[in-house]
Amino acid sequence: RKDLPGLQPDLRLAQEMGEGLGQRALLQRTLPPFPEREKERHNMTTVVWFKRDLRTHDHAPLTAASELGEPVIALYVVEDDYWQLPDTSDRQWAFARESLVDLDRQLAGAGNRLTVMRGDMISVLQTLKRSHDIQRVFYHLETGGQWTFDRDKAVIGWCTEEQVEFREWNQFGVVRRLKDRDLWDKAWTGLMRQPVLPAPKHLPAPESPVEGALDPALVEVNAGAACPDRQAGGSR
């Protein structure tokens, strides 16, 4: 595998993860800002991409974005192809939808709102690039199946091509792209010892709302039979 431009080698990553990065969540990969963008770094819009991490507390990408003091689009994308996979179900979507509604409530308390879009991730990012000239994409590394793995690689490729800075943070004990397991224990221990982050008190909203954003409470997906006795979503 050839690394994308600007990515750190696996070994260096492993060493950094073992020794700690001085941050709450261990940074997996980052594409640094492009030199020609440095003069434009005022008022740059950052996308915080929510996947299955539907919370505001202990959320390193959200905290990092809030500390920049610049506009943030808190984004969740309803990907219909994902919800047609054999290991997804209506009960999972119902839980996710309730969690999205609660996440929107939490973000409103920080002066922002959740932006829910529908479609494939690359198309949504292209739309946001045109409408809000997004310059950063922050997100948690997801441990899922082949579909989400391929989707994440496509996002990294798009960011590289469009010269959009991206950053991944780890949130679990799973460490991708290690050549061996020699440093896994150090990486896991370093992550588990990090303090829990509080929810950001203020999250600057974009200057204009995203056109076409959906009300999470009204979104439906065709993911199979319902389960009335499932666990409710949200943090309350």
Locate the predicted segments by residue.
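Short acidic, glycine/proline-enriched helix-loop-strand junctions
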Residues: 148-167
